[in-house]
Regions:
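Compositionally biased intrinsically disordered regions enriched in Thr/Gly
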Residues: 2-236
């Protein structure tokens, strides 16, 4: 699928805007605080022939379903932990560590024009142990078609984007090799469904915690700046 961005120097505002929904709750063994985005059409475009309301509905449903699936997965673990904790406490005089399972989700709209939107969701879970885990989920859409964009879509047809991106990341890693795993645990190349998001000046490739670097490094990110990679990218 070809992405029709439009010239970034002559950008066009999208026909939709992003509202935020917050849900939160605290109980004995589980708490969550979640803010997730909801796309809405500007009033003047609600009945415009060019824009399909179903596209917005489908995008919102996909994002909401992902958020609830993440929350409910941790909630299910919290229920199981509560049962184990209660059973142990009733059978022993010993003290057991009691803690809450936690979910925090927030988001940032990093790009929103030229019929393209990019939203980065930061998801955190704590399920016991030394620390919680943080995940990034990026939602990149063509708002005219409803298609969820892949990294390949960002590049012109015929461009070997995998080679370009892999070489760039390898160069960045070589600049600070002490920050990354080596050998079999290190970076071997981007995946077919490589996560990324778009911001105002580039395309950000990212990896999960522990994927190519130690936990203390955080989520590794590598930005292909528009002004450096423009000749490869899929602009009109």
């Amino acid at each position: 699928m070809i992405v029709k961005w439009g010239d970034i120097l002559d950008s066009r505002a999208n026909y939709s805007y992003v509202a935020q929904v917050n849900i939160c709750k605290t109980s004995e063994f589980f708490k969550y605080n979640i803010t997730y985005p909801v796309l809405k059409l500007y009033d003047k475009y609600v009945y415009h022939d060019m824009y399909d309301r179903e596209i917005i509905i489908n995008i919102n449903n996909e994002i909401c379903e992902d958020v609830m699936e993440f929350k409910n997965s941790v909630k299910k673990q919290a229920i199981a932990y509560k049962k184990r904790y209660t059973e142990k406490l009733s059978k022993s005089d010993e003290d057991y560590v009691k803690y809450q399972y936690e979910v925090y989700i927030n988001n940032e709209v990093t790009y929103d024009r030229n019929n393209i939107i990019s939203i980065v969701m930061t998801k955190y879970e704590f399920t016991g142990g030394a620390h919680g885990m943080t995940y990034l989920d990026a939602y990149n859409y063509n708002l005219l078609t409803g298609d969820r964009l892949t990294l390949k879509d960002m590049f012109k047809p015929g461009v070997d984007y995998e080679e370009i991106v892999n070489n760039f990341i390898k160069e960045e890693i070589n600049n600070k090799p002490e920050n990354y795993f080596k050998g079999d645990e290190g970076f071997k190349g981007i995946s077919e469904n490589q996560p990324f998001y778009i911001d105002e000046d580039g395309i950000v490739i990212y990896f999960g915690l522990y994927e190519i670097a130690p936990y203390y490094i955080g989520i590794p990110k590598f930005k292909l700046k528009f002004d450096e990679f423009n000749k490869y990218l899929n602009y009109n």
